[in-house]
Amino acid sequence: MSNNQQTSDESRSSGIVVSGTRPTGALHLGHLNGALKNWVQLQKTARCFFFVADWHALTTDYAEPGGIAENTRAMILDWLAVGLDPDVSVLFRQSQVPEHAELHLLFSMIIPVPWLERVPSYKEQQDQLQGRDLSTYGFLGYPLLQSADILLYKAARVPVGEDQLPHVELTREVARRFNRFYGPVFPEPTGMVVEAARVPGTDGRKMSKSYGNAVALTDDADAVHTKLVRMVTDPRRQRRSDPGDPKDCPAFRLHEIYCTEQERAEVTQGCRTASIGCVDCKKVMIRRVQDELAPIQERRRELTLRRGITEEVLAEGRKQAAAVAETTMGEVRGAMGLL
């Protein structure tokens, strides 16, 4: 560790932060506004561990794992392009730190199955992803693997979307149960819900790679326009002359994220009086999205020219993550009598 990095670490005193993303496809506006912008700010004040959750990708995509390696490389490029700094944050791949799996296994010995079955996303994703067989332990147990991901680094805070809060609460319960059986090893982390955590997709549902409703960070200006100009709006506006209400319009949620107060006021007035159509309403929002993505995409192109950059970042991140993970697992094995 360099002197500059050590000084930086010492100045970031607000506790350890842990979060990850599954490499199941291109990152999109939901990731950017729901996680990545927040991560970039958090790395200034906290010791951050951000990981590519490739084992988590197998919980739903176990039958077709071929894209994980390339998706991992693309994800690291996106992270660097939006501003994550590998000299400040630990960026690593989950499967390269096997202690994640070991801690998950040990947790599985003490956690009741009903605790996993009651996690809301367990039923929700089964309903949303009906074309896949999700009757596996891996899918049932992925919130417990998340608990291992978090507790392995003794995180104080976990930045999540609102729908992931039950996973953090499960992690707190796991920590309490382990500590009750074996002594005080793990802290109880808190979930951080960030503003704009739930970004709507083009169909009005939460933006998700799985739903096919996402605007990718790598989409060029034409692709962004094509996708967002067709985004669903207030269903009452069947005709151009029908008035609507922005509070019932999924597209307006992107206005709230991207547009100025004056722009939102003008759009709101035009919608409620039917003085503008939905396509005209979306134009200013689309332009704002395009303007934000352009410099990110330029930085990404520059990074792509640096041969081996993703491998270098992941190798250094693995080294730093493994050092912490090994220390924690030494404590866990000792507490459980497994030394």
Predicted feature descriptions by range:
Residues I76, G83, I111-W115, A155, ...:
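A generic secondary-structure signal for well-formed alpha-helical elements
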Residues S2-A148, Q297, R301:
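N-terminal Rossmann-like or analogous alpha/beta NTP/dinucleotide-binding catalytic cores
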Residues E102-H104, R118-D127, G131-F181, V185-D203, ...:
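Classical nucleotidyltransferase
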Residues P23, V158-P159, N213:
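A generic structural motif
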Residues L29-H31, P166, R172-L339:
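Conserved nucleotide- and phosphate/pyrophosphate-binding catalytic cores
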